[in-house]
């Protein structure tokens, strides 16, 4: 994926060195956008191997409205371990906001169900938006949402998605986010009878941690390979009925994994 390598290079060459919450230090730019045509292949990195199992299970976990890491641990996914409390809870993070956004009268809004229904009944609406950023509950979250708002758009029978990500850990997090939202777009397209269009990824604070510089430089020496295809079980017509077994990535060839520490 040339778009991703261009982002890495842009931040390394033009970014500003800054301090950060974790004390690690970053080099960052503010405001960057990438676009991926999903008809041209599934946008997963080929210049380092990604753990696709983690990406799929995390997305299914979000869609379940779950905020405890028990499901993830059961399926060998450890990406949230550092932030969970002793009971495995994370507070009202993504799944809660997506599926149970609290209202002042004590009710809840299922933003995802509302989104799907809106795409079916009023595809031309400009209100197909889901937000995970709830200012009233941010302090109760183990980690406030980095990928905090997304919008869907329908044109010529194709469904496109734009994500706004306030904070992007380019080396470790952003590759996961690209694949996750590309997959979500494909899933929503299938259950609404549309074709997958573009995934547009807009980043606010796009940063490389100081202890990822060497790894980023190594990745820039590698040449992108052709993108694989994501095959989704066509029998699934309900977004909340997808299971891990309904997805198969074919033709995925990637360079070896590059290890890097997580800044907590």
UniProtKB/Swiss-Prot annotation:
* Superkingdom field: Bacteria
The UniProt entry's GO CC annotations, sorted and at most eight, read: cytosol
- Presence of keyword rRNA-binding: no
| Localisation per UniProt entry | Cytoplasm
Which pathway does the UniProt entry assign to this protein?
A: Pyrimidine metabolism; dTTP biosynthesis
Q: What is its EC number?
A: 2.1.1.45
Listed binding positions for (6R)-5,10-methylene-5,6,7,8-tetrahydrofolate are 51, 169, 263
Catalysed reactions, semicolon-separated:
dUMP + (6R)-5,10-methylene-5,6,7,8-tetrahydrofolate = 7,8-dihydrofolate + dTMP
GO MF terms listed in the record are: thymidylate synthase activity
Give the protein's function: Catalyzes the reductive methylation of 2'-deoxyuridine-5'-monophosphate (dUMP) to 2'-deoxythymidine-5'-monophosphate (dTMP) while utilizing 5,10-methylenetetrahydrofolate (mTHF) as the methyl donor and reductant in the reaction, yielding dihydrofolate (DHF) as a by-product. This enzymatic reaction provides an intracellular de novo source of dTMP, an essential precursor for DNA biosynthesis.
| PANTHER family cross-referenced by the UniProt entry | THYMIDYLATE SYNTHASE, THYMIDYLATE SYNTHASE 1
For this entry, the protein name equals Thymidylate synthase
Q: Which organism is it from?
A: Sinorhizobium medicae (strain WSM419)
